[in-house]
């Protein structure tokens, strides 16, 4: 039976009035568990390729699916051993999903609503197998092809959670051009969802994060909040609110879900809160002065000091506590402090995908997926249009084995070479990032202008033009990455321990 392994991710969500151009932006690092590396690929899924009857590899749950899926683009695992694991995607209706941010709920919640875990058959006692619920493997595949808006996505996901349950605690992001919703699972069948305020950013490590919930809104207009229909009764029946004491866990028509449902452990203070603190410190430095890397009350969402760009998101999701005593590549602090906390940009990142839905662009070309593979400290994201029938081979045809013919493995090789000589190779890494992002912005503007000038409105011609732009971006990435690999290899070769600074008389 396949093993269910937890992922380790970091998420940033940017409301449309907090972003530099009015877009909604949802972004997440997809990090494997310690000691594991998952190759990634960028693929487009046609309606005919979408299953009509779905069976989970990990939980064995079986679900009949609607017969009207739409096309969507995703960045899943290459290896099928743990199922599809779509991780990040945008459909042709400009709805985006990122799933999942692994979180944790406390033991009282798990006792009241246990996770729905696969129970293998007990042949000796004549008991058949009992399937588990849905999880990270399944969620995007079950939701994204069938929804027209982010709200619809929340409602479809909620129905699936309540019907089949889940075997793990997760945060799920769903967005469209107007709204971003963040869903957190509560035990096996319960859930809450909060809309990211338009003028704010949400910052989320691997920890249940929502820190304010308004039941009055959830059970009336649902403008900003949604939840399980019985959530208040669930809290009261199982005395979950009592754990909050005087800290605001339950107060009239609202509560602090982080206190009621979440955790605050010593591990959180090493693994989770420091990541939230660093994002907070970068986006809202004045207010962040009141918090430390181990604070339990770092806000789930904040109003950034400046409008947030794709470059800000890219930097943060590849960051490693730069400018602090906790930077593993830094010179501040001590050897202990530089390895005290888990950085955001980590060695086992599979990909970072930031999905930008632009209100000023035509519907056909509105959504862009900024994609990077491998450790974010040594690479950068590049823009790819989501509304396509096919994707570039350099990102699509990732092999299970190491190969410089694909972006994923090239980035992994460069990161491993550069890590040991961080400062000596930093110019090559930073120059690559600047060149790729600059080219990407120019390419998007040029493609947008070409579509507007041509006045193309028929779907096939627009899709073909977007695919051509994606190919051009991938070709540039490949050429620039090949040069970068050579530069980093040369520098690292000169710094090998067996190097000797003397040549024979003929050289």
What residue spans do the PLM features occupy?
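Short, charged, surface-exposed loops that flank catalytic or proteolytic processing sites
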Residues: 146-152
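Short Pro/Gly-enriched beta-strand edge/turn motifs at strand-loop
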Residues: 66-71, 154-155, 331-339
């Amino acid at each position: 039976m396949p093993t269910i392994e937890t992922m380790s991710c970091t998420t940033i969500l940017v409301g449309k009035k907090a972003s530099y151009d009015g877009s909604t932006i949802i972004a997440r690092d997809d990090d494997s568990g310690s000691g594991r590396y998952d190759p990634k690929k960028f693929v487009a899924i046609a309606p005919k390729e979408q299953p009509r009857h779905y069976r989970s590899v990990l939980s064995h749950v079986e679900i009949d699916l609607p017969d009207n899926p739409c096309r969507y683009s995703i960045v899943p695992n290459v290896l099928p051993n743990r199922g599809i694991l779509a991780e990040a995607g945008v459909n042709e209706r400009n709805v985006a999903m990122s799933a999942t941010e692994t979180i944790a709920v406390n033991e009282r919640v798990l006792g009241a609503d246990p996770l729905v875990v696969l129970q293998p058959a007990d042949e000796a006692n004549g008991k058949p197998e009992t399937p588990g619920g849905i999880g990270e493997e399944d969620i995007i595949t079950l939701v994204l092809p069938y929804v027209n808006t982010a709200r619809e996505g929340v409602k479809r996901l909620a129905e699936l959670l309540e019907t089949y349950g889940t075997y793990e605690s997760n945060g799920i992001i769903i967005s469209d051009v107007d709204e971003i919703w963040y869903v957190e699972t509560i035990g096996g069948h319960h859930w809450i969802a909060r809309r990211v305020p338009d003028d704010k950013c949400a910052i989320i490590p691997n920890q249940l994060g929502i820190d304010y919930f308004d039941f009055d809104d959830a059970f009336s207009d649902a403008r900003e909040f949604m939840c399980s229909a019985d959530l208040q009764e669930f809290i009261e029946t199982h005395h979950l609110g009592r754990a909050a004491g005087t800290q605001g866990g339950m107060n009239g028509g609202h509560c602090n879900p982080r206190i009621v449902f979440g955790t605050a452990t010593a591990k959180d203070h090493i693994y989770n809160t420091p990541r939230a603190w660093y994002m907070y410190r970068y986006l809202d430095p004045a207010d962040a002065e009141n918090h430390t890397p181990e604070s339990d009350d770092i806000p789930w969402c904040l109003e950034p000091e400046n409008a947030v760009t794709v470059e800000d998101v890219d930097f943060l999701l590849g960051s490693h506590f730069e400018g602090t005593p906790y930077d593993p590549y830094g010179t501040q602090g001590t050897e202990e402090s530089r390895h005290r906390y888990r950085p955001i940009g980590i060695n086992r990142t599979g990909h970072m995908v930031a999905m930008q839905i632009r209100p000023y662009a035509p519907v056909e070309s509105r959504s862009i997926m900024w994609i990077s593979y491998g450790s974010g400290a040594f690479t950068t994201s590049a823009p790819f249009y989501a509304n396509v029938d096919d994707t570039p081979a350099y990102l699509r045809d990732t092999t299970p084995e190491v190969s410089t013919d694909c972006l994923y493995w090239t980035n992994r090789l460069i990161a491993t070479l550069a890590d040991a000589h961080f400062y000596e190779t930093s110019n090559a890494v930073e120059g690559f990032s600047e060149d790729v992002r600059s080219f990407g912005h120019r390419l998007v503007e040029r493609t947008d202008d070409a579509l507007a000038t041509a006045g193309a409105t028929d779907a096939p011609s627009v899709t073909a033009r977007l695919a051509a732009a994606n190919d051009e971006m991938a070709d540039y990435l490949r050429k620039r990455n090949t040069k970068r690999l050579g530069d980093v290899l040369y520098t690292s070769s000169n710094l090998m321990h067996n190097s000797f600074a003397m040549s024979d008389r003929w050289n």
